[in-house]
Amino acid sequence: MRALVLAHFERAAAQRHGGMNMSDLIKLTPIFHEKIWGGRQLETVFGYDIPEGPIGECWAISAHPNGDCQIAEGPYAGHTLSWLWAEHRELFGNCEGKEFPLLIKILDAKDDLSIQIHPNDEYAAEHENGSLGKTECWYVLDCEPGATIIVGQRAKDRAEAAQMIEEGRWDDMLNVLPIHKGDFFQIDSGTVHAIKTGTLILETQQSSDVTYRLYDYDRPGTDGKLRPLHIEQSLDCIDFDVQAPTDGTVTAPEVDGVTELESNPCYTVDRVRVNGSKTLDQRWPFMCLSVIDGEGTVCGAPVHKGSHLLAPSTVTSIDLEGKMELIVSHL
């Protein structure tokens, strides 16, 4: 996918220009989703104006049909990101791809999420109406003392996994890890996983909303009925060769304030720390920027914790000032 999307971008790169200001960056209006496991931290921690109820997800940068963000200001205000991708591909270096490929979320897990898995691109295309698969990664923004997550499972093959699921041997099957603020986890498609109680996470993922549940704690959904499970699809999708992590400590070096957290065929994700001023080179079809702590300016305009911006390919450098921390992603 990444190679496909980048194919035309490289040929168009010479046409880009620099010297951009804030008006050239794309500010989007986030979309909020109620979840039975959600809380209120998107309001109390980030200051978002969220609906009543248990709000579990902020879709901050998204062109997915289940949450297509509107452009908040500028010449394209009122249009959606999917519209911009379809009608003004020149802003993305004329790169290929049917849909905008990434989705940036913040998740507030007041309660446990279901034990779940996501398909790869091939399985999703065949079984989910041509959808992308879902590879994702998590940066732990905050968590309660003693918080844990699930990443990976111990069954050696489909038959053993099916038996463990049927017998409810979740403690034997699942790889449970303690987490701390600042931890990072890469979750490849085919990996059994779950975010658990008391966790606030920034998620970078493929633009997909396909989730298969193995177990949901026998709890009712918002309609009072048990949410459906997807055992056969989950068994189809488990990658039994995945090596479960032992912890999420970031060990990559920080170079001039930038730490590369992950780079794979779907995305590259960096943590950027600013204490004063810094300039980021923008050499990609687009760049997603999420301020996760502090405040400052981006290209001269004020930003703060919870601000999200999309830099198109026409923006070749991004000036950052202040004291803040960002998660930055690109293809």
What would you call each of these model-derived segments?
Residues 5-12, 16-156, 216-244, 269:
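Transition-metal
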Residues 99, 107-112, 122, 143-146, ...:
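Ligand-binding loop in jelly-roll beta-barrel domains
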Residues 109-111, 135-157, 161, 274-299:
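Glycine- and acidic-residue-biased ligand/ion/polar-headgroup-sensing regions
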Residues 166, 170-173, 184-186, 192-243:
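An exposed, glycine/acidic-rich loop-and-rim segment of catalytic or binding clefts
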Residues 175-185, 300-315:
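Short acidic-glycine-tyrosine-enriched beta hairpin
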Residues 226-284:
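Functionally critical, mid-to-C-terminal surface segments that flank or help form catalytic/ligand
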